[in-house]
Amino acid sequence: MNINPKHLAYLKSKTYTIAIVDGFILLCLALVANFYAGRFATFHAGNSVQDIVLSNIPVFDVSTIFIYGPIVMWVMLLIYCFNKPHKIPFILKSIAIFIIIRSAFVSLTHIGPFPDRLIMGSDSPDWIRLFTFGGDLFFSAHTGLPFLLALIFWKEKALRILFTATAIFFGIIVLMGHLHYSIDVLSAFFITYTIYNISKWMFKNDFTMFELK
């Protein structure tokens, strides 16, 4: 198998290796934080509130798209990153910071889920319960993470359009299933923009590497 010489140079670089390892460690810590924040928020969930969108639309069964839609997105991103490994450290760390900040938000206010909502059945894969818990509402990761990728790839028009459209689509999906309040979806765009800029500030070297052709 022929390996692109430029890719090989990155793989042999100690700086790159450290950046990748740091990114994976940070992402693992973020996922642990997400797990405990989600369980905490769900256990302490209070009353539900009215919502101008959810109160006026029926519940749709969007479980398949809700579960497997993000998997398709992550597989596409993974394939892309294999071809451009220098972009991986900044992407990893930005996603990790997103998850950590969202975990903090989830832990703060414990509004209960909307009473008339889609319930994941017993036929749902067990692993989904490691990432979503029912009370981890604010703000929507289904909306925020694709938009984060849109911001990261803003200079690449096709990816910018793809990930922005994905963020909007997933936002509509979680509202159709009454899985998030409308404020969870709308706020995700604004909070994610701030997270993206925090990532650029925190990981300047990784961002510089990301920008390389």
Located regions from the model:
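N-terminal transmembrane-helix/juxtamembrane module of multi-pass inner/ER membrane proteins
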Residues: N2-M73, I111, L118, P125
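C-terminal membrane module of polytopic membrane proteins
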Residues: S187, I191-K213
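Alpha-helical transmembrane segments of multipass membrane proteins
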Residues: L26-N34, G38, I101-V106, I191, ...
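Membrane-interface loops
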Residues: A41-I52, F82-L159, A167, K204-K213
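Interfacial helix-loop-helix junctions of multi-pass membrane proteins
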Residues: P113, L137-F138, F169-N197
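Aromatic-anchored segments of alpha-helical transmembrane domains
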Residues: L31-V32, I99-F105, A167-H178
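Active-site His/Glu-centered metal-binding helix of metallohydrolases
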Residues: G69, G144, S182, L186
